[in-house]
């Protein structure tokens, strides 16, 4: 396995007198998608901020090791933009990373929304804004991409399309991806490793092994591991656009299996 980009070793974090994380460890390696799952208040966002260097561990309670020169892209759960600002998508990206137009166009193309470059950000749908935020995170060609609830507000087909796109980004850039989610419907089938968090690591491993772990069922309920919930898969011979609609990029000489 490649050398980790970030290693968190036995870290505890206390914020405002409250223990938010306790003895947590994880390793993020290039080319792998890791997903943090857990209920609200489990410490998922705090752990992500720890990885990003925005939160420090408690004194004498673990270490965080980051590879020197690590480039990080971050996609927040929410972003507030003043409705009165006449802000185009291109300008929005420029404010995050000033540079040549070609780099912004390339990031939007990789996120599947190059056609939105001159659109006003206030005119974007929820799914379109998620793709633009992803393009923003990709501008620096990151070694590590951190996404906080990237599919929130997107329907199931759109989520599947987004996770498929993230796999493509991972393959093209060779980056590590850290996903944060509380939605079990699709995310576990779109990841290499799952870490189940409830202020500490309850269980971790492949999606299949975690879905069978008693600690996982204790946290999410006895039905959480059923195929139509945690281990949803979508085998098809078509692609999806950012709204989740099927697009036919394959050869129609044979039968189609559109769902």
From Swiss-Prot:
| Compositional bias per record (Basic and acidic residues), positions renumbered to this chain | 233-259
Q: Please state every residue range assigned to the domain named ABC transporter.
A: 6-223
Please provide the Gene Ontology terms (biological process) for this protein: response to zinc ion
Query: Which Pfam families does the record cross-reference, listed alphabetically?
Result: ABC_tran (PF00005)
The residues listed in the UniProt record as binding ATP, with positions renumbered to this chain, are 38-45
Q: Does the keyword Transcription apply?
A: no
Q: Name one GO molecular function term.
A: ATP binding
Q: What keywords are assigned to this protein?
A: ATP-binding, Cell inner membrane, Cell membrane, Ion transport, Membrane, Nucleotide-binding, Translocase, Transport, Zinc, Zinc transport
Report whether NAD shows up as a keyword of the record.
Answer: no
Show the segment(s) annotated as Disordered: 230-259
Question: Which GO cellular component terms are attached?
Answer: plasma membrane
Q: Where found, per UniProt?
A: Cell inner membrane
Catalysed reactions, semicolon-separated: Zn(2+)(out) + ATP(in) + H2O(in) = Zn(2+)(in) + ADP(in) + phosphate(in) + H(+)(in)
UniProt-listed SMART domains: AAA
Q: Which cysteine residues pair off into disulfide bonds?
A: none
Instruction: Provide the membrane topology annotation.
Output: Peripheral membrane protein
Family of the protein in this entry: Belongs to the ABC transporter superfamily. Zinc importer (TC 3.A.1.15.5) family.
**Function description:** Part of the ABC transporter complex ZnuABC involved in zinc import. Responsible for energy coupling to the transport system.
How would you summarize the oligomeric state and partners of this protein? The complex is composed of two ATP-binding proteins (ZnuC), two transmembrane proteins (ZnuB) and a solute-binding protein (ZnuA).
User: PANTHER family under this entry?
Assistant: METAL TRANSPORT SYSTEM ATP-BINDING PROTEIN TM_0124-RELATED (PTHR42734), ZINC IMPORT ATP-BINDING PROTEIN ZNUC (PTHR42734:SF9)
The cross-references to NCBIfam families, in alphabetical order and at most eight, read:
PRK09544.1 (NF007090)
Q: Which protein are we looking at? A: Zinc import ATP-binding protein ZnuC
